[in-house]
UniProtKB/Swiss-Prot annotation:
Function comment: Involved in the degradation of certain denaturated proteins, including DnaA, during heat shock stress.
MF terms in GO: DNA binding
Record family assignment: Belongs to the HspQ family.
Name of the featured protein: Heat shock protein HspQ
InterPro entries recorded: Hemimethylated_DNA-bd_dom, Hemimethylated_DNA-bd_sf, HspQ
Gene3D superfamilies membership: Hemimethylated DNA-binding domain
Gene: hspQ
Keywords per UniProt: Cytoplasm, Stress response
Cystine bridges: none
Gene Ontology biological-process entries: response to heat
GO CC terms in record: cytoplasm
Keyword Metal-binding: no
Subcellular location: Cytoplasm
Keyword flag Cytoplasm: yes
Amino acid sequence: MIASKFGIGQQVRHRLHGYLGVVIDIDPEYSLEPPAPDEVANNDTLRLSPWYHVVIEDDEGQPVHTYLAEAQLTYEDMDAHPEQPSLDELAASIRHQLQAPRLRN
């Protein structure tokens, strides 16, 4: 069983670039097309660790889906980000949906 450091709905930061993101899904290991030789995913250790689907914002504030290795991410301590309120709203919405009971027929 592989344990992940980050959860769905959690805000994270990219270690190298520093951008804020929200985890929307987790893969237990790299699960896209075979990586090119120069890609991060070509590293066996990274490829076999958890990978995260993360939503970030581009320079115009539009959402962008990224796929990042666990080693590329770090925890985000702040709860509010006035410069990127849509990511705060996305994280809160996901967490709420995960906690809300679902009615079934």
